[in-house]
């Protein structure tokens, strides 16, 4: 199959089975760059100079559903984290209201499917980091009522009740309150997202959950040994759980040679006063200056396909998906430059012999199914369980984690 033929097949497949992407940081990029002023950054226009995402490129990429991250910095704690998360939610709702012919809010699997049938991109929300609930199950429920349909248990730092993959162990997984968070998420129908969490947290969550979990943007640790990726024993546990691991495109998570380069680049950014996750024009300019002096190892669509090949082998075709992390990273793989690029990845997988039925599961069906399954579990649990009023002090004590 020629590259051109594969790309044509990929586009045709995505017209029938569009991508549901697990993680896009457009709301935070809009906060950082224009203070949520959508007049200053109109995504109905070409925003390629500033963003990975705009409406035309979402359409070109065959995106039918997007989990918009309502991420806030881990430095935000308590009330500040909660209010900033609500501001992020408000941004997603404002985008849907401003572009109703393109974006449609979706809170359920049925609403996701209905949005696609109406020719719109289903817009769902995921909160990225347990700091967004400020150790409060009532706040967790409030975020659910506002439309949040997954919670990533941690971001890059630990929370008092769960360990992150990129922080020093403190709880050795989940505390008793962390288990209660997972169980209350199950009762609500909010997906438990295990991207960013430590392997012991992954394993504790899989033991605690009554519903399928997701990894909204994580790849294979066996292919690239970065702590943000998923160990094989956890991937192998997904069929029994029913969960879905959504492979990410972040170069330092998919290409071993990019790990050390990224560490050095982040150190240079820190010296100049930038946060490692800063994607403002000033931070990007500093990064590009470093890249000019120290050439960057370049991932490609084939690099990501290597991860998906391995994840399919270990977890099975019913338990994988895609979570690009666009607008949350400074660099993307060659050929996966922005949200218009999903056809390039699908074309690469077609050339490797993936069937159209398998690709339809990867792009669309697995994500719809995991959301629908979580909703079914919640309906059953709500017949017998009341909202939890447990507190972290009651379950973990005044001295913190177990």
Place the predicted regions along the sequence by residue.
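Short, contiguous, pocket-lining structural segments
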Residues: 170-177, 193-201, 230
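N-terminal hydrophobic targeting/anchoring segments and the immediately downstream early-domain regions
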Residues: 1-172, 225-402
């Amino acid at each position: 199959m020629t590259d051109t033929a594969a790309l044509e097949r990929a586009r045709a497949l995505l017209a029938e089975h569009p991508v549901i992407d697990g993680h896009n940081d457009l709301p935070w990029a809009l906060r950082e760059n224009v203070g949520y002023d959508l007049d200053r950054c109109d995504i109905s226009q070409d925003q390629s100079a500033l963003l990975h995402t705009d409406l035309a490129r979402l359409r070109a990429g065959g995106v039918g559903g997007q989990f918009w991250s309502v991420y806030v910095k881990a430095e935000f704690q308590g009330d500040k984290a909660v209010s900033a998360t609500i501001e992020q939610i408000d941004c997603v709702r404002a985008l849907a209201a401003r572009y109703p012919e393109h974006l449609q809010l979706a809170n359920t699997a049925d609403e996701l499917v209905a949005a696609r049938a109406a020719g719109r991109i289903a817009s769902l929300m995921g909160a990225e980091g347990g700091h967004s609930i400020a150790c409060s199950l009532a706040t967790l429920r409030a975020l659910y009522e506002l439309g949040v349909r997954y919670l990533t248990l941690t971001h890059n730092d630990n929370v008092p009740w769960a360990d992150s993959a990129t922080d020093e162990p403190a709880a050795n997984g989940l505390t008793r309150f962390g288990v209660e968070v997972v169980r209350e998420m199950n009762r609500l129908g909010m997906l438990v997202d295990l991207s960013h969490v430590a392997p012991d947290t992954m394993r504790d969550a899989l033991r605690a959950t009554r519903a399928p979990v997701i990894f909204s943007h994580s790849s294979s640790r066996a292919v690239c040994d970065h702590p943000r990726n998923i160990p094989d024993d956890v991937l192998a546990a997904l069929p029994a759980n029913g969960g879905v691991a959504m492979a990410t495109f972040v170069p330092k998570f998919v290409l071993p040679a990019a790990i050390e380069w990224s560490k050095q680049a982040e150190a240079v950014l820190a010296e100049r006063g930038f946060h490692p996750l800063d994607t403002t024009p000033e931070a990007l300019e500093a990064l590009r200056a470093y890249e000019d002096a120290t050439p960057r190892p370049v991932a490609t669509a084939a690099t990501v396909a290597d991860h998906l090949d391995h994840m399919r082998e270990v977890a099975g075709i019913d338990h994988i998906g895609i979570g690009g992390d666009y607008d949350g990273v400074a660099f993307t793989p060659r050929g996966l430059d922005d949200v218009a690029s999903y056809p390039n990845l699908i074309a690469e997988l077609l050339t490797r012999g993936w069937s159209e039925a398998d690709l339809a599961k990867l792009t669309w069906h697995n994500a719809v199914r995991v959301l629908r399954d979580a909703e079914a579990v919640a309906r059953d649990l709500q017949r017998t369980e009341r909202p939890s009023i447990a507190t972290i002090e009651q379950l973990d004590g005044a001295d913190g984690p177990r």
